[in-house]
Curated annotation (Swiss-Prot):
Source domain of life: Archaea
Keyword rRNA processing listed: no
Recorded family membership: Belongs to the eukaryotic RecA-like protein family.
InterPro entries according to UniProt: AAA+_ATPase, DNA_recomb/repair_Rad51_C, DNA_recomb/repair_RadA, DNA_recomb/repair_RecA-like, DNA_repair_Rad51/TF_NusA_a-hlx, P-loop_NTPase, RecA_ATP-bd, RecA_monomer-monomer_interface
Chain's role: Involved in DNA repair and in homologous recombination. Binds and assemble on single-stranded DNA to form a nucleoprotein filament. Hydrolyzes ATP in a ssDNA-dependent manner and promotes DNA strand exchange between homologous DNA molecules.
Pfam family for this entry, one: HHH_5
UniProtKB keywords: ATP-binding, DNA damage, DNA recombination, DNA-binding, Nucleotide-binding
Gene giving rise to this polypeptide: radA
SMART domains found in the cross-reference section: AAA
Protein name (Swiss-Prot/TrEMBL): DNA repair and recombination protein RadA
GO biological process: DNA recombination; DNA repair
Molecular-function GO terms, alphabetical: ATP binding; ATP hydrolysis activity; ATP-dependent DNA damage sensor activity; damaged DNA binding
């Protein structure tokens, strides 16, 4: 057997061994992580090999106090899970076929999205006040609970509310309309009110343990930008705000990818005073949110209870828009 063939076989065996390692293996099983370090990591939300593999060196270094050691631990976790190995585009395609989707409850919007809101992705919903962003979030928190044959995932939701707009009464209306027990529907939603940007980010860290312990398939942050805009006003604070927002969005994306959950964030709009033709509004958050979100939807009001939603940024969807109505039962075609 040639040395090249031996090397190829060895690499294949290494990849196969990595695949067979459970990503939920306790973090203390990692090389270089004992009980003391393991306890420190768990206190900050790093419970498993997978948690560490998706972390940054800076994050772990702040916990264990040594950057070089943090790098070694992360490299060990990634090697254990085979994250250093290249795979074929065909394998990527096969993996994407396993992506789960949550129906929005609006057939035309599901078709526009290719089946609904994807797991392992961050979907951003942009719009003015009263455009229906929160209504859509409420409906998704109900829809995710439905069985798969009805467009759901038979799962629970986490709802982080930054503007005090969550209404359990609305959840109950939507649940009844879809044949769910209203009290049980509420019981399947883990709710938290975020009172500052720091609190909001801490809640996302805590969400990780809830996702691990419960059957959670949806995380909603409504709205992602509100506290950041109010706490960092003016150009002099813009760089600090964007740096902090960048970490927050990165944490959400890692959470979505690591635990196969759908993340939906809502975003506000801001006016461009120098625009005289076309739409003078643009999403808040700048390039951080533009690059951080996987899919971007724009909601706007039409006449009476009709709303129009447009997909304006996606890795593979064509641009398009559909309309829906907001009724007592929820969002419908």
């Amino acid at each position: 057997m040639s040395s090249k063939k031996k090397k190829t076989d060895a690499e294949a065996a290494q990849v196969q061994a990595a695949v067979e390692v459970s990503p939920d293996l306790d973090v203390e099983e990692l090389e270089g992580v004992g009980k003391v370090t393991g306890a420190k990591l768990k206190e900050k939300g790093f419970y498993t090999v997978k948690d560490v593999a998706f972390a940054s060196v800076k994050e772990l270094a702040e916990i264990i106090g040594n950057e070089e050691r943090a790098l070694q631990i992360i490299e060990s976790a990634r090697k254990m899970l085979g994250l250093h190995s290249f795979i074929s585009a065909l394998e990527v395609y096969e993996r994407r076929k396993k992506i789960r989707r949550i129906s929005t409850g609006v057939r035309s919007l599901d078709e526009l999205l290719g089946g609904g809101i994807e797991t392992r992705a961050v979907t951003e919903v942009v719009g003015e006040f009263g455009s229906g962003k929160t209504q859509l979030c409420h409906q998704l928190a109900v829809m995710v609970q439905l069985p798969e044959e009805r467009g759901g995932l038979g799962a629970k939701a986490i709802y982080i509310d930054t503007e005090n707009t969550f209404r359990p009464e609305r959840i109950m209306q939507m649940a009844r309309a879809r044949g769910l027990d209203p009290d049980q529907a509420l019981n399947n939603i883990f709710y938290a009110r975020a009172y500052s940007s720091d609190h909001q980010m801490i809640l996302v860290e805590h969400a990780k343990s809830i996702v691990k312990q419960h059957n959670v398939a949806l995380i909603v942050v409504d709205s992602v930008i509100a506290h950041f805009r109010s706490e960092f006003p003016g150009r002099e604070n813009l760089a600090e705000r964007q740096q902090k927002l960048n970490k927050h969005v990165a944490d959400l994306l890692r959470l979505a990818d690591a635990y196969d959950v759908a993340v939906v964030i809502t975003n506000q709009v801001m006016a461009q005073p120098d625009v005289f033709f076309g739409n003078p509004l643009r999403p808040a958050g700048g390039n951080i949110l533009a690059h951080g979100a996987t899919y971007r939807l724009w909601l706007r009001k039409s006449k009476e209870n009709i709303r129009i939603v447009k997909i304006f940024d996606s890795p593979y969807h064509p641009e398009g828009e559909v309309s829906f109505r907001i009724t007592e039962e929820g969002l419908i075609d």
